[in-house]
A protein has these predicted regions:
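Conserved nucleotide-sensing/catalytic segment adjacent to the nucleotide-binding pocket
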Residues: 92-120
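Acidic, Mg2+-coordinating active-site environments of NTP-dependent enzymes
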Residues: 6, 10-16, 135-264
């Protein structure tokens, strides 16, 4: 080793080795990984999806939607990693910072324009997303499902919130405000604050007109859209996808048409 990065200096220092003491080794690794791969997140539009439920669905369907719109797209999810059309096996919800940057770098090589990424509370807590430039963040909902890792629900919520706290001011923070934690996510963010809901007044509001075995008919901000996805929870997912696609510049008519083609 030429240099060792550590949080605590060892008792016996070896000659010829530089020791760099940092407050957080995982945070330092994340910034080093970004720099090593030449900051690949800056060369595409990266959107992080966080929340207890809906992360995989929202990220995967956004990948599908932008592929159908003719773009080169990336996906970092629990199920798989996609570098445009090439599929790789996923190991964690949020891979380690070296893996994330490696795949973002591959996406740069392929000319990928948009990447959608699941962001877990474990990943945020372990600094795996540090050093990445996000175009936007999406908050789906919060329930007591992951308290095996976090000591309290408040800690779990605050870890999620820290993701939005760190978004740059030119990014967007899109949150579900039917979940009472949605507004908490927006408290200290510098990003543009955008809301979506089915029950409350919001920037993007949907109403379920028909709920059938074959799909849902939704009214989204005065426009009707049919989707093959079923269930109330998918109405929220579709709304998050519609809003994100519009925030990323997709034209409304095309957005509605592509949503009607999505399959879970």
């Amino acid at each position: 080793a030429v240099a060792i990065i550590c949080e605590e200096l060892p008792t016996n220092l070896q000659d010829g080795i530089t020791y760099i003491q940092v407050e957080s080794a995982s945070q330092a690794l994340a910034f080093m990984a970004s720099n090593y791969y030449e900051n690949p997140s800056e060369n595409l539009k990266l959107v992080g999806v966080t929340g207890t439920n809906g992360k995989t669905t929202v990220a995967t369907l956004l990948y599908q939607l932008f592929k159908k719109a003719g773009y080169k797209v990336g996906l970092l999810s629990t199920v798989k990693i996609m570098v445009d059309d090439k599929e790789y096996k996923a190991t964690h919800t949020t891979p380690d910072s070296l893996t994330i940057n490696k795949f973002l770098s591959l996406m740069n090589d392929e000319g990928v324009e948009f990447c959608f990424m699941e962001v877990s509370s474990h990943g945020i807590h372990q600094n795996r997303t540090e050093g990445l430039k996000f175009e936007g963040g999406i908050f789906t909902n919060l329930s007591h499902d992951h308290l095996d890792y976090h000591d309290t629900f408040a800690e779990y919520r605050d870890v999620k919130k820290s993701f939005f706290d760190n978004l740059p001011k030119d990014a967007f923070a899109l949150v579900n405000i039917d979940d009472k934690n949605g507004l908490v996510m927006l408290q200290n963010t510098k990003a543009r604050k955008i809301t979506y809901a089915l029950k409350t007044y919001a920037d993007y509001k949907a109403q379920i007109l028909e709920n059938q075995l074959g799909g849902l008919l939704l009214k989204v901000n005065e426009s009707e859209v049919w989707t093959r996805l079923i269930g109330n929870f998918n109405a929220y997912n579709i709304l998050a996808i519609y809003a994100t696609a519009e925030l990323l510049g997709l034209e409304k008519v095309e957005n509605l048409r592509l949503i009607s083609e999505l399959e879970s």
